[in-house]
Curated annotation (Swiss-Prot):
Provenance organism: Providencia stuartii
Spans traversing the lipid bilayer: 38-58, 98-120, 141-161, 163-183, 213-233, 238-258, 268-288
GO biological process, one term: ubiquinone biosynthetic process
Family classification: Belongs to the UbiA prenyltransferase family.
Gene Ontology MF terms: 4-hydroxybenzoate polyprenyltransferase activity
E.C. numbers: 2.5.1.39
Task performed by this protein: Catalyzes the prenylation of para-hydroxybenzoate (PHB) with an all-trans polyprenyl group. Mediates the second step in the final reaction sequence of ubiquinone-8 (UQ-8) biosynthesis, which is the condensation of the polyisoprenoid side chain with PHB, generating the first membrane-bound Q intermediate 3-octaprenyl-4-hydroxybenzoate.
InterPro entries: HB_polyprenyltransferase-like (IPR006370), Prenyltransferase (IPR039653), UbiA_prenyltransferase (IPR000537), UbiA_prenylTrfase_CS (IPR030470), UbiA_sf (IPR044878)
Name used for this protein in its record: 4-hydroxybenzoate octaprenyltransferase
Record's catalysed reaction(s): all-trans-octaprenyl diphosphate + 4-hydroxybenzoate = 4-hydroxy-3-(all-trans-octaprenyl)benzoate + diphosphate
Length: 288
C-alpha cells in the first residue's frame, strides 16, 4: 500500500516537473548548445556539457514547479490545466515549495563546479526564473521575461567557456528572446479565450488580431540577427543552409496559424523544436 502511494506521489511530482513533456527542456537546450559551441568554437569540454545539459533539465523542471505554484488559483478554471497536480490536490503547496528548492539547490551545486563569473551570473538567472510566472499578473510581456529566463544560459555558457561576454553572446541572447516571444505566443494562442476569462495577460492577448503579422515580423528579425551571429562567429556555409531551412519552417508555422485554431497553433509551437535542432546542427557542422 505504501509503495503504491509513493509511486502515485512520484507520478504527481513528475507531472508537476513536466518530465512527460520534454518540449520545454528542448527549447531551452538548443540555445544553450548554440552558445557553448560558438563560445568554444569547437566541441565544449565534457564537464561543461554535462553541467549545462543537466542544469537545463533541472531548471526547466524548477520553472514548471514555480509556474504551477504561481498559477495554482487560476489553473483550475482553465480546461487544459485544471487537472494539473496542484489544482487537483495531488501535490500540496508545501511539497511544491520543497521540490522547487531541491531542484534549484541541485542546479546550484552543478554551477559551483564552474568559474566565479558563471556562479554570479547564475544568481541573476535564478531571479529571472523566480519572477517569470508572476509577470502575467501585471504585464502582457510575459514572453519577453520568459525569453530572458530561458536564454540566461547563453551568457552563462560564454562565461563558463571563455570567461567573456562578447557581442555575439548578446546578439544570440536577443535572438532567444525573440524566439521565445514567437513560440510562447503561439502556445498562448491556444489558451487565449481562457486567459481572457480569468484575467491572465500574454502577448497573444496583447497582439490580438495582429498576432500572426507580429509573429511573422519577429521571425524575420530573428533570421536577420542569426545572419549577424553567423558573421560574428565566422560560421560556415552549412550554417546558412540550416538557417534557410529554419526560415522555411517559420513559413510552415505561419500556414499552421492561418485560422488560429487551437490544435494547429500548438503544432506550430512544437515545430520550433526542429528550428532549434536544425540551427544547432548547422553550428555543430561548422566547427568540424
Amino acid at each position: 500500500m505504501e509503495g503504491s502511494m509513493a509511486l502515485s506521489k512520484w507520478h504527481a511530482y513528475s507531472r508537476l516537473m513536466r518530465i512527460d513533456r520534454p518540449i520545454g527542456s528542448l527549447l531551452l537546450l538548443w540555445p544553450t548548445y548554440w552558445a557553448l559551441w560558438i563560445a568554444a568554437q569547437s566541441i565544449p569540454s565534457l564537464h561543461i556539457l554535462i553541467v549545462f545539459t543537466a542544469g537545463v533539465f533541472l531548471m526547466r523542471a524548477a520553472g514548471c514547479v514555480i509556474n504551477d505554484f504561481a498559477d495554482r488559483h487560476f489553473d483550475g478554471h482553465v480546461e487544459r490545466t485544471k487537472h494539473r497536480p496542484l489544482p487537483s490536490g495531488d501535490v500540496t503547496e508545501k511539497e511544491a515549495k520543497i521540490l522547487f528548492a531541491s531542484l534549484v539547490g541541485l542546479s546550484f551545486l552543478l554551477v559551483l563546479t564552474l568559474n566565479s563569473m558563471t556562479i554570479w551570473l547564475s544568481v541573476a538567472g535564478l531571479a529571472l526564473a523566480w519572477i517569470y510566472p508572476f509577470v502575467k499578473r501585471v504585464s502582457h510581456l510575459l514572453q519577453v521575461v520568459l525569453g530572458a529566463a530561458f536564454g540566461w544560459s547563453i551568457p552563462m555558457g560564454f562565461s563558463a567557456v571563455s570567461e567573456s561576454l562578447p557581442l555575439v553572446c548578446w546578439v544570440l541572447f536577443l535572438v532567444n528572446i525573440l524566439w521565445s516571444v514567437i513560440y510562447d505566443t503561439q502556445y498562448a494562442m491556444v489558451d487565449r479565450n481562457d486567459d481572457l476569462k480569468i484575467g491572465v495577460k500574454s502577448t497573444a492577448i496583447l497582439f490580438g488580431q495582429y498576432d500572426k503579422l507580429i509573429i511573422g515580423i519577429l521571425q524575420i528579425v530573428m533570421i536577420v540577427l542569426l545572419v549577424l551571429v553567423g558573421s560574428l562567429a565566422d560560421l560556415g556555409a552549412v550554417y546558412y543552409i540550416a538557417l534557410s531551412l529554419s526560415a522555411l519552417l517559420f513559413i510552415y508555422q505561419q500556414k499552421l496559424m492561418v485560422d488560429r485554431e487551437r490544435a494547429p497553433c500548438f503544432k506550430a509551437f512544437l515545430n520550433n523544436n526542429y528550428v532549434g535542432l536544425i540551427l544547432f546542427i548547422g553550428i555543430f557542422l561548422s566547427y568540424l
